[in-house]
Amino acid sequence: MPADTPIRKKPNAYASVVDPDTGYCTPGAFELERLFWHGAPKYNHVNEVWPNLYIGDEKTALDRYSLEKNGFTHILNAAHGRWNVDTGPEYYSDITVEYYGVEAEDLPSFNLSQFFYPAAQFIRNALSSPSSKVLVNCAMGRSRSASLVLAYLMIYENMTVVDSIMQVLKHRCILPNRGFLKQLRELDIQLALERRGTEDTAKKAQKDD
């Protein structure tokens, strides 16, 4: 490589990103990790983290009797698969629930972001009915399931990544792995740009009127 050839650096996932138009700052990954250092509720098998939206673990997902007794209508399994939380439509065939499975591994290298929008849409559709109760589970109810719930709050409840984390931490002890946090951070940047574009379009329309 010639000496004067510029070296392209990879984007730093740990650096904060500031939107110059709104002043909103998407925190760096390290700053997001620090949010989990503070106290959180005692670990339980399942917690309601948003109205009618629950995060739970494998024990919760496997207990069909309790799911039916407590009125759950939708289950999003973020650890679907034979070697994970092996449930599915057939497992729940004796109770009335709608099932959605995501085959995800709790690894920093796993691309969970490919499921952010489909999972968020499933949750949104379920919560459109006031009588629905949604369980989002994985093995421990701390990383995969929590990340999908955070993405839902960001996409459909218009929360920032920090707001969504703080909302869930009020009710449940969660700890998404570092790779998932980076992907949620990227989603935050993307959503901030989309919202700015929507605001710019609205302002332009007002001027045209």
Curated annotation (Swiss-Prot):
Could you tell me which InterPro entries the record lists for this protein?
Answer: Atypical_DUSP_subfamA (IPR020405), Dual-sp_phosphatase_cat-dom (IPR000340), Prot-tyrosine_phosphatase-like (IPR029021), Tyr_Pase_dom (IPR000387), TYR_PHOSPHATASE_DUAL_dom (IPR020422)
| Limits of the Tyrosine-protein phosphatase domain | 44-193
Where would you find the membrane-spanning parts of this chain? none
Which GO MF terms does the UniProt record name?
Answer: protein serine/threonine phosphatase activity; protein tyrosine phosphatase activity; protein tyrosine/serine/threonine phosphatase activity
Catalytic activity as recorded in UniProt: O-phospho-L-tyrosyl-[protein] + H2O = L-tyrosyl-[protein] + phosphate; O-phospho-L-seryl-[protein] + H2O = L-seryl-[protein] + phosphate; O-phospho-L-threonyl-[protein] + H2O = L-threonyl-[protein] + phosphate
What SUPFAM superfamilies does the record tag this protein with? (Phosphotyrosine protein) phosphatases II (SSF52799)
Question: Out of the domains of life, which is the source?
Answer: Eukaryota
Task: List the Pfam families.
Answer: DSPc
In which family does this protein belong, per the annotation?
A: Belongs to the protein-tyrosine phosphatase family. Non-receptor class dual specificity subfamily.
Q: What is the official name of this protein in its record?
A: Dual specificity phosphatase 29
What is the organism of origin for this protein? Xenopus tropicalis
Gene responsible for this protein: dusp29
